[in-house]
């Protein structure tokens, strides 16, 4: 108590990228399900903030269009991807992102298979059949069930961008990711929707810090 808090500064940096405050946008698929402008509307809404937006590989807008929309803003763009069973999908996505000016690659690690999410089965949206992924063919790609920490090293070999691994909840996994070449990790349990029985994210943060 009794500390001078009259001049609070929330600015920080992540992997050398300055941000106004330590809050960014996690990857969310198919923004056009929520609004016709999709990811472009999201960029417009946060373009005045100097923060990080992670674009989902299952975005409903071309990543090149998102990059153009963000180029005159203070927004830092990172591209999320998976290790797909056909590595060509991953390679192409990463290289397109790098060519478009993205500043980081986020690898989702907690999806070796596509989970059955019961709430998604129960819920239906009027436009879900009309909104498709723009950067990959959602009907052809599959997650790789054989992906390992070695794939972080492989991913690092095909890009100069920093690799951020998302979906780790233990200190042991965090250490393995860093040893494999990851520049950072994102502690995440995928909103509790991917792996049944996952601990809460704040528990994973504690283990990872240790």
Where on the chain are the PLM-derived regions?
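An N-cap/entry alpha-helix motif that binds or orients negatively charged groups
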Residues: 1-16, 126-147
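N-terminal capping/small domains of soluble enzymes
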Residues: 1-99, 105
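Short, small-residue-enriched loops and turns at beta-alpha junctions
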Residues: 31-33, 85, 113-115, 141-142, ...
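Glycine-rich beta-to-alpha transition loops that act as phosphate-gripper elements at the mouths
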Residues: 36, 57, 83-84, 146, ...
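A structural motif
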Residues: 50-51, 102, 160, 182
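Short, ordered loop/turn segments at secondary-structure junctions
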Residues: 58-59, 110-112, 168, 190-192
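Conserved anion-binding
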Residues: 101, 105-141
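Glycine-rich phosphate/ribose-binding loops and adjacent secondary-structure elements
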Residues: 151-210
């Amino acid at each position: 108590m009794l500390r001078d808090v009259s001049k609070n500064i929330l600015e920080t940096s992540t992997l050398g990228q300055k941000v106004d405050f330590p809050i960014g946008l996690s990857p969310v698929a198919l923004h056009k399900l929520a609004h016709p402008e999709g990811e472009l509307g999201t960029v417009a809404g946060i373009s005045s903030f100097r923060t990080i937006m992670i674009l989902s590989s299952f975005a409903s807008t071309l990543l090149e269009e998102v990059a153009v929309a963000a180029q005159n803003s203070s927004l830092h763009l990172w591209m999320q991807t998976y290790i797909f069973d056909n590595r060509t999908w991953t390679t192409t996505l990463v290289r397109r992102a790098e060519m478009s000016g993205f500043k980081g690659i986020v690898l989702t690690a907690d999806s070796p298979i596509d989970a059955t999410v019961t709430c998604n089965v129960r819920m239906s949206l009027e436009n879900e059949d009309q909104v498709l992924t723009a950067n990959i063919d959602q009907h052809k790609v599959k997650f790789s069930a054989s992906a390992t920490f070695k794939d972080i090293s492989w991913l690092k070999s095909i890009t100069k961008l920093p690799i951020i691994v998302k979906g780790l909840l233990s200190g042991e996994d965090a250490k393995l990711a860093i040893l494999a070449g990851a520049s950072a990790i994102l502690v995440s349990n995928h909103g509790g929707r991917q792996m049944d029985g996952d601990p809460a994210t704040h528990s994973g943060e504690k283990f990872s810090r240790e």
